[in-house]
Amino acid sequence: MKTPIVAAIAALFLLGANAQAQAPSDAQIASIVVTANQVDIDAGKLAESKGSNAQVKAFGKQMVTDHSGVNKQAVALVTKLKVTPEDNPTTQSLKSGGAENVKNLEKLSGAAFDRAYVDHEVAYHQQVLDAIDKTLIPSAQNAELKSLLVSVRPAFVAHLEHAKGLQSSLGQKN
């Protein structure tokens, strides 16, 4: 079950490591933002339908709502700026890690599903925050793109804290 988590986290670690060698362009950052949010939307939809714990289901629904909102903001901004999101190794790794996570979650049910979903959310949000802080914000050249990243950061912090609280209530401490 840890494989998709490792793949998604590895993509974000690579992003941080690559930032030292070559910072991502604004077009690549836009693609990373949309992809990272879509990965969490897909997992959230599954949690809404498959979660056995009411709090896990509600958290999944919140992830779908919040991350869909961020994607709408990102798409509106890149449209306004006439920037075409550029696929890159980080987005490819995020997509494959996200698909693998959903595939593995689909095999689980009950409390095992709830724990696996929440564990992934804790790890994923921590790594997304690290990428936002260490790579995406520092690398963004466009002031509006940088502003978007700064403005959505508190929601990622709140999601991480919420997921940690759920993790604790489910008896998991990672």
Which residues does each PLM region occupy?
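His/Met- and acidic-residue-enriched segments that coordinate or traffic transition-metal cofactors
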Residues: K2-I9, F13-N174
